[in-house]
């Protein structure tokens, strides 16, 4: 989603609150809870929940391994739910031609650098760079090349844009910023 006027362009960035993250966190939570319940049932020698039969599972080594997988899965699920709660990675890119400033804001993990705020002058922007890697794990990323700072990604690497969409976005942004486009 973006908002544009003659001199200002604001590009809103979706963070970790995506449908796929909700689905993975929920599936991982339920699966790891099931593993932990089966491991606990094999330790106790009786069914904690009748949905998960544990008579055939011996506690050593299968029950221990299932309990370990269940605990590890719960930790990973907790991590995913925390990133969703904190909306890590969300923010905005603001390009202001009137002031000649580019502002990039992202939410990070809680702590010292929770708010990530970058500010550049437009005159320091060298180019808009497109990096396309085709194949099994295709990757299309849009970068802003800053003099003395290197390349800053403007689009998340896990967003599945087509090559045409990336090129269109790069062309519009390069036209707005009045900088060239580089393709790698």
UniProtKB/Swiss-Prot annotation:
It is found in: Plastid, Chloroplast thylakoid membrane. The chain crosses the membrane at residues 21-43, 58-80. One of its GO terms (cellular component) is chloroplast. It holds the Pfam family Ycf4. GO terms for molecular function: mRNA binding; unfolded protein binding. It is a multi-pass membrane protein. GO terms for biological process: photosystem I assembly. The keyword Metal-binding does not apply. This is Photosystem I assembly protein Ycf4.
